[in-house]
């Protein structure tokens, strides 16, 4: 094989990009893009500057000495006053940047992470009591001790620094309002959490003021910054990049939200139902407020009275679970039109803390409005699946430094397949859902207290089947039971071939209760059910799940994101109502030899409130069906069923 010669592409001002012949075209295009490219660390050039090879920022020797990194602490002035003192809140910021930004006039792009967690969180969290009658107020709110205040913290965090500093970026951290040394009140969503990171990005672009102290007047500027900013983070830290992006702030070029909570309604409610995040039974937005509140003690009385004990109980409606203006303000989908930043989203399919719809609803919306976006799905739980560094590097190299690496032409969806060994690259797909997927109706056949049928054949006659709610039985136990009065189960025959599902299943159900209120929980499972715990409150046998409040039947008339402000109404005992709602989105391959089953329950021990046992649900099988997104459509399903 002929040895390939390396080529140096020379630009003005003695800046270089290292290339190989096969990437020469990319390098040439980049050389005329107006971006300052870099030498390779092996070349005999005195100055260290960002270097790119095969479309990715490379580690540069001159940026590696941690003892020479410049560290700064400052406070950036925001445009809001959330703590009622009549002064604009300031947020605490730290900066780590290459020393060459001082000694050689180097300007660099920024990787930025913001969080309410950096200063620590509350210990021994106490939750709401979930054992009470549906539709009644919860027992008294538990009293929690908020996080300890730490008055001196010049270094906020070290996340992202070791990854990006040696590659020619600066790294910036900030503490969310009301946490650490940032002023203000925690609001858990809403405008302050959008405008605080916006202020930091404005400061990096010379549009906002930064100060050397919390309350002083000595200003500091970011003269070393190019103005190009990328944000990233996981969980709450992944929510904030998207929140900042909804403001449309200039300079925020790219974000990588990992397992972001994109709507506090969809975190604490589902389709009109009080539904807790997996692993945090009894948590609501007020507990999360206490959990993160690490800010100044002298402001806590005001913030607690105004927000936690004032706004929240007046608006969050833990009694009914309905969507309203309070929740809409904390739903980033309502503000998605402002997003311009290129968005690489990541989520785990076994994340039952922040469930997958949080990411998929945003991905779908951004595609529709033409924002550059890419999706990474893995098989793990909450926060456990950061996209490979190559993906993140290509994303930031392209959007922050203008490298023409073709990332915008990559496969739109990268999915880690089931049982993939650690380190196995994700499988690329043209998009998500898989473009070859089509919705297929499957129907329920009698026998659900044991195992009725699930097939493509609609019921010939009207049949009603009943279950009796009893929350003491976990869903996995009910799925494994040969017979149970506490659930209805409908299963396919054993699959003769693997079945690939890609998208969001939807259930259309006609149901009646013997009481004015009832929980409704739906699981899609594989049989025999594997109850091995996986991810965040997941089990291997769970394909996906969904929950809804039958009282909200007037607004549950079609699939898709739930954002109706129409309140629920008490059920008339014995009267059937029709509901249509989504289960959680997923991309799963069901192996041959398994049976796919729909399980209908009332209360879900790990997620819903726990009313006393005895509520009866009746399901009209003829007027109920499941819609499955099957890759290959009806033909693939029939083939998998051996038809």
Regions found by a protein language model. Give the residues of each.
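Short beta-strand element of the alpha/beta-hydrolase
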Residues: 105-116
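N-terminal cap/lid segment of alpha/beta-hydrolase-fold proteins
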Residues: 59-106, 495-497, 510
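Accessory cap/linker subdomain of secreted extracellular hydrolases
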Residues: 41-54, 60-63, 79-82, 88, ...
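C-terminal, loop-rich substrate-recognition/catalytic regions characterized by aromatic stacking residues
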Residues: 41-47, 55-60, 73, 376, ...
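Catalytic histidine neighborhood in serine/cysteine hydrolases
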Residues: 366-383
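Conserved alpha/beta-hydrolase
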Residues: 165-181
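Conserved alpha/beta-hydrolase "acid-adjacent" motif
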Residues: 352-358
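Short beta-strand/loop motif that positions the catalytic acidic residue
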Residues: 339, 345-347, 351
């Amino acid at each position: 094989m002929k040895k390939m010669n390396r080529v140096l592409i020379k630009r003005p001002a003695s800046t270089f990009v290292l290339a190989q012949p096969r990437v020469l075209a990319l390098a040439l295009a980049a050389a005329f893009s107006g971006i300052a490219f870099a030498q390779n660390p092996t070349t005999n050039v005195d100055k260290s500057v960002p270097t790119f090879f095969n479309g990715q920022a490379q580690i540069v020797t001159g940026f590696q000495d941690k003892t020479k990194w410049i560290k700064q602490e400052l406070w950036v002035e925001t445009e809001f006053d959330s703590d009622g003192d009549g002064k604009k809140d300031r947020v605490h910021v730290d900066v780590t940047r290459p020393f060459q930004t001082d000694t050689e006039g180097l300007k660099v792009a920024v990787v930025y992470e913001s969080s309410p967690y950096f200063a620590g969180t509350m210990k021994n969290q106490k939750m709401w009591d979930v054992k009470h009658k549906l539709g009644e107020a919860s027992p008294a709110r538990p009293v929690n001790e908020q996080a300890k205040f730490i008055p001196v913290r010049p270094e906020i965090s070290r996340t992202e620094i070791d990854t990006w500093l040696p590659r020619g970026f600066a790294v910036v951290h900030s503490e969310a309002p009301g946490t650490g040394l940032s002023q203000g009140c925690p609001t858990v969503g809403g405008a302050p959490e959008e405008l605080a990171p916006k202020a930091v990005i404005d400061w990096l672009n010379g549009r906002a003021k930064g100060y050397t102290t919390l309350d002083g007047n000595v200003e500091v500027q970011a003269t070393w910054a190019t103005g190009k900013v990328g944000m990233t983070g996981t969980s709450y830290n992944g929510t904030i990049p998207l929140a900042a992006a909804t403001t449309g702030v200039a300079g925020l070029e790219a974000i990588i939200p990992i397992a972001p909570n994109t709507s506090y309604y969809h975190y604490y409610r589902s389709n009109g139902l009080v539904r807790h995040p997996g692993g945090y039974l009894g948590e609501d937005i007020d507990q999360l407020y206490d959990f993160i509140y690490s800010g100044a003690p002298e402001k806590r009385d005001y913030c607690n009275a105004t927000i936690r004990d004032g706004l929240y109980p007046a608006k969050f409606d833990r009694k009914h679970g309905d969507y309203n203006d309070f929740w809409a303000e904390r739903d980033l989908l309502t503000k998605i039109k402002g997003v311009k930043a290129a968005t690489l989203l990541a989520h785990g399919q076994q994340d039952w803390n922040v469930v997958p719809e949080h990411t998929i609803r945003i991905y779908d919306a951004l595609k529709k409005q033409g924002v550059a976006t890419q999706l990474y799905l893995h098989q793990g739980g909450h926060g456990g699946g950061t996209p490979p560094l190559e993906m993140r590097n290509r994303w930031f190299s392209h959007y922050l430094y203008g490298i023409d690496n073709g990332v915008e032409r990559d496969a739109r969806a990268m999915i880690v397949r089931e049982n993939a060994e650690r380190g196995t690259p994700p499988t690329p797909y043209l998009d998500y859902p898989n473009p070859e997927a089509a919705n297929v109706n499957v129907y329920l056949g009698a026998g659900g207290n044991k195992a009725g049928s699930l097939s493509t054949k609609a019921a010939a006659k009207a049949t009603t089947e009943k279950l009796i709610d009893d929350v003491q039985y976990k869903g996995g136990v009910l799925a494994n039971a040969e017979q149970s009065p506490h659930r209805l189960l409908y299963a396919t025959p054993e699959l003769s071939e693997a079945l690939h599902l890609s998208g969001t299943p939807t259930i259309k159900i006609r149901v009646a209760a013997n009481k004015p209120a009832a929980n409704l929980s739906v699981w899609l499972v594989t049989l025999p059910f594997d109850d091995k715990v996986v991810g965040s409150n997941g089990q291997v046998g769970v394909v996906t799940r969904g929950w809804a409040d039958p009282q909200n039947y007037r607004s549950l008339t079609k699939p898709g994101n739930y954002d109706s402000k129409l309140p629920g109404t008490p059920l008339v005992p014995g009267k059937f109502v029709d509901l249509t709602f989504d289960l959680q989105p997923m991309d799963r391959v069901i192996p041959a030899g398994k049976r796919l089953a729909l399980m209908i329950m009332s209360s879900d021990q790990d997620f819903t409130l726990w009313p006393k046992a005895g509520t009866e649900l009746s399901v009209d099988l003829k007027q109920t069906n499941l819609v499955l997104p099957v890759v290959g459509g009806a033909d693939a399903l029939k083939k998998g069923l051996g038809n």
